[in-house]
């Protein structure tokens, strides 16, 4: 059998270096370049990011432009009302940063409020689980601190997409189809944009989104500097008409959700204004070394360290000897994943509110201790977090509203790297805010109402998220 080759073992023409045997059959070429590259969840998004690179922008500029485009192109997967954790590697400075792009809970969102209203589990739909939208502030923070382009350069193409339209495609059509009856019966503001359902290839538009974000952009046009213009647009979104319109919508109407009752949102203008001013955090990424490669993830407010824990556990096994994707290989992989996710459930949460023992969780000693729990002959069906007694695996009482997530990666000619995972604020879980063209997110569903849990609900706290971009 022909030996598989790593990408580094091929020359610029795709020929294996030092190898005379046939190259393994492939139907697509290896994509290579010297100017930069963008990969994204939709081809038009990737093209927009690539155009920014060609115009002289860096990886951050390109990634943000692609990210804004994804909010228009993939509303079934993410939206400007959602969140986006970001990882950036700065080649010249030889350092990486993480942007905590997760919105926080409103001041009124307390465990007492939910329990006193008979809510025992935060629903996955409607207005009740809405956090303050984080996406726009996260993109702007990345652009301000690490980008070079203007907000018009990176937001303009998305506005053009929303205004002029783009072809309907199967995944979006299916996403709308799943909730079309709800659009008709409960969420007419969503139906006004996405119904009647377009056929594949038919051009669809979101003029409300285009008007909203053009007004956001115009708020900074009179400013004398790039930085001042971005900040003026941030204020317009979080302190001005966008926030006011979203709050008027969420406070004046109650929408049915998975609890069986109808609820309004819990936001206030202060929640939005404070988040817009100081809510987005730039942090050090969490990292671990796996077989000589440094892998970087966002902190324990995300799912990032779970992968690092898995890698620490896997490092103790001879995976090559097990054979790629054999039953033995997959068994070891899955058992390591179970142990890492059990620790996530027990320990992870917003580090501003919970003490997360990351140093211990990512230590070699802890990995060796946990690795001994793995039986290579039998699967374990218990939740086994470290240092506490095993628990039976349970399930949530409410059905989870399924959405999706998308992603964008960018690299530029200077060696800068950008990875972001925008999610939430999708059209399947919450009604579109009238006049704005996008729904609010529902990430509050991730909170626990157990006050002793590290991910317990609290005002101004970020829910633990599953989103997890990576750099290596």
Where are these regions (language model features)?
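Protein kinase glycine-rich loop
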Residues: 309
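Short, well-ordered loop/turn and helix-capping segments at boundaries between secondary-structure elements
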Residues: 141-148, 160, 164, 218, ...
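Short, small/polar residue-rich loop motifs at catalytic or cofactor-binding pockets
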Residues: 281-282, 402-405, 465-467
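Noncatalytic scaffold domains of N-terminal-nucleophile
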Residues: 2-47, 51, 57-232, 237-295, ...
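Flexible, polar/acidic helix-loop-strand segments at domain edges
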Residues: 305
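Active-site rim segments in enzyme catalytic domains, especially the processed small/beta chain
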Residues: 72-98, 253-270, 411-472
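Short, surface-exposed charged micro-motifs
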Residues: 287, 407-408, 470
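Internal maturation/activation junctions in enzymes
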Residues: 15-18, 206, 243, 247, ...
């Amino acid at each position: 059998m022909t030996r598989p080759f790593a990408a580094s073992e091929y020359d610029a023409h795709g020929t294996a270096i030092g190898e005379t045997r046939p190259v393994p059959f492939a139907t697509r070429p290896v994509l290579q370049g010297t100017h930069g590259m963008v990969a994204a969840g939709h081809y038009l998004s990737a093209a927009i990011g690539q155009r920014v690179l060609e115009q002289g922008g860096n990886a951050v500029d390109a990634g943000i432009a692609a990210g804004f485009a994804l909010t228009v192109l993939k509303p079934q997967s993410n939206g400007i009302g959602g969140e986006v954790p970001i990882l950036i590697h700065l080649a010249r400075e030889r350092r990486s940063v993480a942007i905590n792009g997760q919105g926080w809970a409103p001041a009124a969102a307390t465990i007492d409020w939910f329990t006193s209203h008979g809510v025992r589990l935060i629903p996955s739909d409607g207005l009740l689980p809405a956090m303050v939208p984080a996406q726009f502030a996260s993109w702007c923070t990345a652009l301000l601190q690490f980008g070079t382009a203007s907000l018009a350069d990176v937001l303009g193409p998305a506005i053009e997409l929303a205004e002029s339209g783009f072809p309907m495609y199967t995944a979006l059509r299916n996403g709308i189809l799943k909730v079309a009856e709800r659009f008709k019966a409960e969420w007419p503001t969503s139906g006004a944009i996405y119904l009647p359902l377009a056929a594949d290839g038919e051009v669809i538009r979101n003029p409300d989104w285009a008007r909203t974000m053009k007004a956001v952009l115009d708020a900074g046009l009179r400013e004398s500097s790039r930085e001042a213009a971005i900040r003026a647009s941030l204020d317009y979104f979080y302190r001005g008409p966008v926030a006011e319109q979203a709050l008027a919508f969420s406070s004046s109407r109650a929408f049915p959700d998975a609890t069986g009752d109808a609820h309004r949102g819990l936001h206030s203008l202060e929640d939005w204004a404070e988040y817009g001013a100081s809510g987005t955090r730039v942090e050090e990424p969490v990292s671990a070394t796996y077989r000589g490669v440094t892998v970087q993830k966002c902190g324990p407010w995300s799912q990032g360290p779970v992968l690092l824990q898995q890698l620490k556990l896997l490092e103790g096994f001879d995976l090559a000897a097990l054979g790629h994707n054999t039953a033995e290989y997959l068994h070891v992989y899955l058992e390591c994943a179970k142990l890492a996710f059990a620790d996530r459930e027990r320990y992870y949460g917003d580090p501003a509110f919970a003490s997360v023992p990351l140093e211990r969780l990512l230590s070699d000693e802890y990995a060796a201790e946990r690795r001994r729990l793995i039986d290579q002959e039998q699967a374990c069906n218990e939740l086994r977090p470290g240092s506490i007694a095993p628990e039976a695996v349970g399930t949530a009482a409410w059905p989870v509203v399924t959405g999706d997530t998308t992603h964008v990666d960018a690299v530029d000619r200077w060696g800068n790297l950008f990875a972001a995972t925008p999610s939430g604020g999708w059209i399947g879980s919450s009604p579109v805010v009238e006049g704005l063209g996008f729904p609010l997110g529902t990430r509050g569903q991730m909170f626990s109402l157990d006050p002793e849990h590290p991910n317990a609900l609290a005002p101004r706290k970020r829910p633990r998220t599953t989103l997890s971009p990576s750099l290596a």
